[in-house]
Amino acid sequence: MTFPDTTSSAAPQATAHAKINLFLHITGRRDDGYHLLDSLAVFAGAADRVTLTAPSNTMSLTIDGPFGQGLEADDQNLVLRAARALQAQAGTTIGGLTESFHLELQKNLPVSSGIGGGSADSAATLRLLAREWNVDQAALFPIAETLGADVPVCVAQRPTRMQGIGEILAPAPVLPDAGLLLVNPGVGVSTPDVFRAFAAGGGIVERPEPFLPDRWNTAQDMVADLNATTNDLQAPALSQCPVIGTVLASIESLPGCLLSRMSGSGATCFGIFSSPESAVAAAHVLNAQSARLGWWTWAGGFHHTGAST
């Protein structure tokens, strides 16, 4: 393989878009402790980026970007774990793949924030190396399942209904050209602590499985259906991180907001608006109101195009 100069924009790269849970229902728990879920996962334009910069004697990683500080580029990093898992699998199935590379992770998304950052980075690494090694994308999903519950849906990187522990993926409704605002208060939330609070608060609620249409024509149509759903982890996360309530109230008060909700196990929250332009305008208002708080915000549209980018 010929690698371009590391300063060239032609260096092989893949984007790791933020995953948003428009709803998240906890439906059961397996004997091994893993929770079962039913969730509608979509992706925002906001993204990390993984780049292959040069051949290397071993898989290696550097991390930069606004949220790169404090992240370890060690063997436990999901980017390196994904690279080595695919290297081992591909070397077995298509023969003799022993190339190693230096990878760069540009970390633009907050960490431990409920938007699948580490999982998305892992999935982007799988897609990137699969392209370089001519590995079929379908072969990535069994590897993704070993790396984390959110990694398979991030490999697909398109609107998807997730069930099971995240390994059962089904088509989602076609999304409207709605606007999306993401807000993170700069506070990390422990997912295990949130699940413990969920269990302490009463745990699983029996409910009918939400009906999802084939398509939503407008943001208003989408929100009408989402209003019949919830995020079961929102209240437990609030008990662990009360500022989430402040964020949700701030989003809900913005002009044009149709729905405010927390994503995943928090602490990132989102607002849905009628158009990307409305979301951007609302973000300007919120940034002026919260400038001293240091909140991270992003506004724009949904990422629709799937895993190839």
Curated annotation (Swiss-Prot):
The active site is at K19, D150. Catalyzes the phosphorylation of the position 2 hydroxy group of 4-diphosphocytidyl-2C-methyl-D-erythritol. It catalyses: 4-CDP-2-C-methyl-D-erythritol + ATP = 4-CDP-2-C-methyl-D-erythritol 2-phosphate + ADP + H(+). The keyword ATP-binding applies. This is 4-diphosphocytidyl-2-C-methyl-D-erythritol kinase. Keywords: ATP-binding, Isoprene biosynthesis, Kinase, Nucleotide-binding, Transferase. HAMAP family: IspE. Signal peptide: none annotated. Its EC number is 2.7.1.148. The keyword Repeat does not apply. The lineage of its organism: Bacteria, Pseudomonadati, Pseudomonadota, Alphaproteobacteria, Acetobacterales. Belongs to the GHMP kinase family. IspE subfamily. It holds the Pfam family GHMP_kinases_C. It comes from Gluconobacter oxydans (strain 621H) (Gluconobacter suboxydans). GO terms for biological process: isopentenyl diphosphate biosynthetic process, methylerythritol 4-phosphate pathway; terpenoid biosynthetic process. GO terms for molecular function: 4-(cytidine 5'-diphospho)-2-C-methyl-D-erythritol kinase activity; ATP binding. Pathway: Isoprenoid biosynthesis; isopentenyl diphosphate biosynthesis via DXP pathway; isopentenyl diphosphate from 1-deoxy-D-xylulose 5-phosphate: step 3/6. ATP binds at P110, V111, S112, S113, G114, I115, G116, G117, G118, S119, A120.
